[in-house]
């Protein structure tokens, strides 16, 4: 390892302990997107945060009081927001990729890439109603 690489490499003993908490999507239509994620993936609103210029809906799987969350963030002034190009998909582990793909499409998602087999997994992509890419994954044993 070069001196420069050694100097910039993170030190395990000083790195903070972290856990993943949430992904936040800024959305155009908060009510519509809430309905989509409820119907397509069974998420429920665990908490609503009313801010001066926006509302946040903290969504989780039904019955979960803690853990990873999807936060939908809607501006109150209905400003124009769009999905940019510098992002990757939100990955969702599912039991049956084909069934989850069909269900999401039936609930308003756009098919983006039909289910296929990859090494050790089955994968498909859909776009939510505002164009965000969602990757559906089922690991094979």
Q: Residues of each region from the PLM?
A:
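Short amphipathic alpha-helices within nucleic acid-binding modules
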Residues: 33-36, 98-103
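Exposed loop/turn and edge beta-strand positions of beta-sandwich/beta-sheet ligand-binding modules
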Residues: 53, 86, 120
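Eukaryotic phosphotyrosine signaling hubs
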Residues: 20-21, 85-89
